UniProtKB/Swiss-Prot annotation:
UniProt-listed SUPFAM superfamilies: HydB/Nqo4-like
Keyword Transport: yes
Molecular-function GO terms, alphabetical: NAD binding; NADH:ubiquinone reductase (non-electrogenic) activity; quinone binding
UniProt xrefs under NCBIfam families: NuoD (TIGR01962), PRK06075.1 (NF004739)
Database matches in Pfam families: Complex1_49kDa
Organism this protein belongs to: Campylobacter jejuni subsp. doylei (strain ATCC BAA-1458 / RM4099 / 269.97)
Keywords from the UniProt entry: Cell inner membrane, Cell membrane, Membrane, NAD, Quinone, Translocase, Transport, Ubiquinone
Reaction catalysis annotation: a quinone + NADH + 5 H(+)(in) = a quinol + NAD(+) + 4 H(+)(out)
Protein's UniProt name: NADH-quinone oxidoreductase subunit D
Subunit (UniProt): NDH-1 is composed of 14 different subunits. Subunits NuoB, C, D, E, F, and G constitute the peripheral sector of the complex.
Gene name in the database record: nuoD
Family annotation (Gene3D superfamilies): Cytochrome-c3 Hydrogenase, chain B
A single cellular component GO annotation: plasma membrane
């Protein structure tokens, strides 16, 4: 009879020095400041961290393997559950990869609606980051104010797609719906009001002595470290590298709108906070321009391509060919040509990209997601060394990770 061998958990094999002067502690995975099921194994010399090892996998759901057993359209709602704070960013990155694989060009109005959803989603993600980061450091008032404004933006998103968190708002070839009546007017009301709220946040934090003591020269990331560890988004721009995929490799209509790329050179937590605050304003600038672009677009919101995209509901109900084509797409899935593609996008947390390998069937042969939080979490191994235990939670909150896209 074969006796099964019990595999030791990998963290039991970590060669931490067992000395009287050192102490090993576990932060998480059940910890309110871990921002999810993250476990950090820390070796301390007094109050100073001398070794750190992130231990992930507590939320692993096998999403990439699940994709291989789903038709392409079926996987869209699953992407919501990666970075569940920015579901539309996940929806878009995946749809853009499939569209590139199929050679689909989406209608102009669909591109504008996608940009509106992405920038609203960026604002909600940044607001949640600021709220929880401030709460970790002790600024309770900012937490409450951020959630107040976030509710207004979530109402706008809910008015479009019916959901506040898991949007499933995009379709391969475009979007599911046109904007509701008076939607742009309500959005512009928010765009006019929100700058005053941002000023309130900055009045509370910018020159707050405790805030600056907890963020200045804390969690410093050099240019070299940011590049070596694959950092993207604000983690990269906060260290002096002015890189934004929306500018470097424009997608949708980002090449037709004017916006800046905020960056800082100090590389510490305070510098990243200032970059985030400026990004709010750039998103508002983009939203105002999208409202103008929308008015001059034709009404089509889905690409016309019977092989990959279903016809309109009216055609499906009245035309036999459209009904049959719709039936085949839903039961067998769209079938892109053989090949592989990688599409990078600028999510609120950094570079989010999907690699898809197609074998010509209705299901991807291989799907791989490149999520920013995964790379930033790995960086804790170097970033936390030399810091004090009291600053670990502040640094984790400042880096802005979400465990849903780390574990997948």
């Amino acid at each position: 009879m074969q006796i099964p061998s019990k595999l030791k958990p990998y963290y039991e094999n970590i060669a931490f020095e067992q000395e009287d002067s050192k102490m090993i502690i576990n932060l998480g995975p059940q910890h309110p400041s871990a921002h999810g099921n993250l476990r950090l194994i820390l070796e301390l010399d007094g109050e100073q961290v001398v070794k750190a090892r992130p231990c992930i996998g507590y939320m692993h759901r096998g999403m990439e393997k699940m994709a291989e057993n789903m038709i392409y359209q079926e996987f869209i709602p699953t992407t919501d559950r990666m970075d569940y704070i920015a579901a539309s960013a996940n929806n878009y990155a995946y749809c853009a990869a499939v569209e590139k694989l199929c050679g689909l060009e989406i209608p102009r109005r669909a591109a504008v609606i996608r940009m509106i959803l992405l920038e609203l989603n960026r604002i909600t993600s940044h607001l949640l980051w600021l709220a929880t980061h401030a709460l970790d450091i002790g600024a309770m008032s900012v937490f409450l104010y951020c959630f107040r404004e976030r509710e207004y933006v979530l109402d706008l998103i809910e008015k479009y797609c019916g959901a506040r968190l898991t949007h499933s708002s995009m379709r391969i070839g475009g979007v599911m719906l046109d904007l509701p009546e008076n939607y742009l007017e309500e959005m512009l009301v928010f765009c006019d009001k929100f700058p005053n709220d941002l000023k309130d946040y900055e009045d509370l934090l910018d020159d707050n002595r405790i805030w600056r003591l907890r963020t200045e020269n804390v969690g410093v990331v050099t240019k070299e470290q940011a590049l070596n560890w694959g950092c993207t988004g604000v983690m990269l721009r906060g260290s002096g590298i002015k890189y934004d995929i929306r500018k470097e490799e424009p997608y949708l209509l980002y090449n037709e709108v004017e916006f800046g790329v905020p960056y800082a050179t100090q590389g510490d937590s305070y510098a990243r906070y200032k970059v985030y605050m400026q990004e709010f304003r750039e998103s508002l600038k983009i939203l105002r321009q999208c409202a103008t672009l929308y008015k001059d677009t034709p009404p089509e919101i889905l690409a016309t391509h019977p092989e990959y995209v279903s016809a309109s509901k009216e055609q499906i109900l009245t035309q036999n060919y459209s009904l049959m084509q719709h039936f085949v797409l839903i039961t067998q899935g769209l079938k892109p040509p053989k090949g592989e593609v990688y599409v990078p996008t600028e999510s609120p947390k950094g570079e989010l990209g999907f690699f898809i390998h197609s074998d010509g069937t209705g299901r991807p042969y291989r799907l791989k997601a490149r999520t920013p939080s995964y790379w930033h979490c790995a960086f804790f191994e170097e970033m936390l060394v030399g810091t004090y235990l009291a600053d670990v939670v502040a640094i984790m909150g400042n880096v802005n990770i979400v465990l849903g896209e780390i574990d997948r």
